[in-house]
Amino acid sequence: MIRFASLGSGSQGNGLVVAAGEGAVLVDCGFSLRGTEARLARLGMSPADLCAILVTHEHSDHLAGVFTLARRYGLPVHLTHGTWSAAESRLAGRADAVRRLCRPMRADADFTVGALTVRPFAVPHDAREPVQFVFSAAGRRLGMLTDCGRITPHVVDVLSPCDA
């Protein structure tokens, strides 16, 4: 079974927890470290329950707290090369420390985190290399779509087979 819960959605910050089995991932983290910890606590979770952070794109409402959270808790950060390139310049001397936590991903190339199979897929948006995700576990599929400039045939094709 796949479980999910929003930590928040809007211009002040975005974050979504997706879990299957004992593993959970955080998609985007647009909140401060303390804010993220509090939001997770409301779900009965802590950052120690997370296996990884996945990043959709480099806009601050999705990225603001990613690298602070990742460094504090030693979490790998999965993001596209384009997103890393856009984010790297904002790290002001911390890029080398953060780079070690980064795991490059490509749109339409599945990877596994815990019990979740993750499929990033490209979407139109005003960012370098934005993606959204389909999560699979135990024969079920959950699609997520947040910032998307327009619904394309590709987006429809990717999300149509999803259960939710």
Q: Would you name each region that the model predicts?
A:
Residues 1-43, 129-147, 164:
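Conserved beta-strand hairpin/beta-sheet module of binuclear metal-dependent hydrolase folds
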Residues 33-80, 164:
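Active-site metal-binding motif and surrounding structural segment of the metallo-beta-lactamase
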Residues 40-44, 111-115, 155-158:
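Short amphipathic alpha-helix with an adjacent loop that forms part of the alpha/beta core around
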Residues 152-164:
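Cap/insert and terminal regions of metallo-dependent hydrolase folds
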